Amino acid sequence: MDKRSLKLKRGAVAVLAVLGLLGAYGLGSLQPWSAAHAETAVSAPVAAPALPLPTGLPDMSAIVARNAPAVVNVSVAGKVRRTAEAPDFPSLEPGDPFYEFFRRFQGAQPHGEQRVRGQGSGFIVREDGVILTNAHVVDGADEVTVRLADKREFKAKVIGADKATDVAVLKVEARGLPVVKTGASAKSRVGEWVLAIGSPFGFESSATAGIISALSRALPDENYVPFIQTDVAVNPGNSGGPLFNMAGEVIGINSQIYSRSGGYQGLSFAIPIEVAMKVEAQLMKTGQVQRGRL
């Protein structure tokens, strides 16, 4: 072998050795860099928490089973005076329990007084028979009957009604009645699921569900109530019924709907339970609500 050939081979070995060192260094340094990079990526602060993956619609059957016995149907009867020349009909909203009656029978009996009936919902807050409902459900009624889910019926006394908040308190003579658990609407968030139980069109213990659409909603001429807006199906007869959160707690009283057709259009409004319970406390104590004035 000549010297020139030997030098070439040694040069090749030297080059291969260098390449081998570079390759080893590259392979050796690749893994630690990747691990360090991955570790940095994992520990880096995240702009927003990851949202839980959807798991399907919530099962509300347990809430209904637990609370339906404490939701009541409220039937009212009253008298309306009419004259032939100028029928004296009150201005009613589509959600009012008397609305459908007047729509169908307006002008049918032109003279004297007419006996009218209506329906709404309510719920028991004390086992000795204290019930919350809407003031407009019992407005003008001289007879109020409460029907429980177990078909028992009681004559109810109107302890008091506050038109400003649309809250009324009824009392029946009974003991050991099922009651709802009240929660805090202030802890609610837009987008949360809610459930209503009531008697739409007289169909007792009907459950409907939806989400909270907005909180602290102000409505025209409603200065005292920061309404909970939902898309829960609420129809005539639901008025006065409870609105539950997914913990099975009452967070509101279904009170009004917004509709151009007279039926449900996805805009329902509930009175926060905190407002209702403050009114209940005053009505139970004095029969009226006192408000501070400047």
What are these regions (language model features)?
Residues 1-6:
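N-terminal Lys/Arg-rich, disordered targeting/topogenic segments
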Residues 9-14, 20-294:
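Serine-dependent protease modules
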